[in-house]
């Protein structure tokens, strides 16, 4: 089940709560020069529509390990809970990662050029800026390790 809140990860953002906006609705020819940006825009758009009703800056959480026959991304791990958000960082944003104790977590930042600028593993507060990530929007993708055979561990990781 996917919901909009989780105590494990919080993004505090001082930004506009809008959707992707395009000045011209005319089709853009995709070619070798713009393919990476176009493919990333397509992936971001699919995520926004499928999980958060088109809303930027809204977390989506997959609260159970992904079944083998229903994976939104190729090769999702069976021992992992996933969370993600598309964040408008044009005016700055902050990622706050709480202490997860011994539990493995990773938070990957993917920019609009499909470049992974950073992967965070430690608790802390991190500024998400265009100087560092080079695009107005990024996907923050979080992974939390669980024992998928233990419902109690899944519940513990998901609170």
Predicted regions located by residue number:
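Bacterial N-terminal signal peptides that target proteins for export
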Residues: 1-9
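N-terminal export/targeting leaders of redox proteins
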Residues: 2-3, 17-25
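Bacterial N-terminal signal peptides
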Residues: 10-18
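A compositional/structural signature for long, glycine/proline-rich flexible linkers
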Residues: 23-159
């Amino acid at each position: 089940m996917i919901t909009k809140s989780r105590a494990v990860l919080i993004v505090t953002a001082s930004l506009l709560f809008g959707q992707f906006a395009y000045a011209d609705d005319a089709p853009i020819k995709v070619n070798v020069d713009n393919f990476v940006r176009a493919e990333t825009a397509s992936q971001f758009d699919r995520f926004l529509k499928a999980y958060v009703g088109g809303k930027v800056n809204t977390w989506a959480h997959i609260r159970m390990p992904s079944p083998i026959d229903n994976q939104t991304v190729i090769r999702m791990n069976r021992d992992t809970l996933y969370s993600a958000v598309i964040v408008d960082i044009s005016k700055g944003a902050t990622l706050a990662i709480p202490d997860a104790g011994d539990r493995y977590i990773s938070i990957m930042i993917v920019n609009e050029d499909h470049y992974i600028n950073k992967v965070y593993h430690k608790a802390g507060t991190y500024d998400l800026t265009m100087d560092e990530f080079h695009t107005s929007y990024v996907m923050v993708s979080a992974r939390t390790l669980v024992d998928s055979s233990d419902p109690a561990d899944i519940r513990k990781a998901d609170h």
